[in-house]
Amino acid sequence: MSIISRKGLIMANETTTKNDSTNVSFGKFKVGGYAYAAPVGTALPTDSESALDPAFQLIGYLSEDGITNTTDTDTAEVKDANGTTVMKVVSSYSESYQFVLIEFLRKAAAQMRYGNDAVTGKDKSMVIKHQMPDDTPVSLVFEIVATGNVKDRTVIGSATRSEFGDRQMHSSDVLGYDLTVNANDMGDGVTSIEYIGIPKGQSL
């Protein structure tokens, strides 16, 4: 398990021969909005800066722990007659993202947790049906601004709700929706794409 790290972009035709402190960065989220959800099939961004499709809804603030990106791999070993491992290959791979939505009164945040059909109403005035979790996949985008104003955008084309944290309701803790989503295959085994410092219209 690892908290999402932010690295400077090295272009394919560049050669670096020295350590560079400007490539070290904190992962600060974009001011004004940084977590968005849309139905699968919505046009996905392919760079760090272009405007998102209008179908993407802001799902609000995340807790101070931000996002935890976890990868899980299994390996298979091949051994010879002496029990010596002669080959080890990765046999499976999966990726997930965990975060806590703390805009408890935002309709889009509640829908992200419970599913669109389980939530009716509007911000600050909702009815939420607590029921079997909705496994309808959604597309997610998270936006970070790295040191030096380098834009870092993570795109999950198909995310399925997979785990839900406990919800405590008392006066000393903020209300929120703690959930983990599984990043499904977007094609060719890719589960999510991160665009770091890629201007609008540029591709690598």
Regions found by a protein language model. Give the residues of each.
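Solvent-exposed edge beta-strands and adjacent loop segments
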Residues: R6-A109, S158-G176
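Short helix-loop boundary/capping segments
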Residues: R106-G157
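Beta-strand secondary-structure signal
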Residues: S96-V100, S139-E143, D178-N182
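Hydrophobic beta-strand residues in large extracellular and virion-surface proteins
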Residues: A35, L140-F142, Y195
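Mixed-charge, glycine-accented linear interaction segment located at domain edges/termini
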Residues: V150-L204
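Beta-strand elements of well-folded, non-transmembrane domains
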Residues: L101-L105, I144-G148, A183-G187
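Gram-positive cell-envelope targeting signals
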Residues: M1-S5
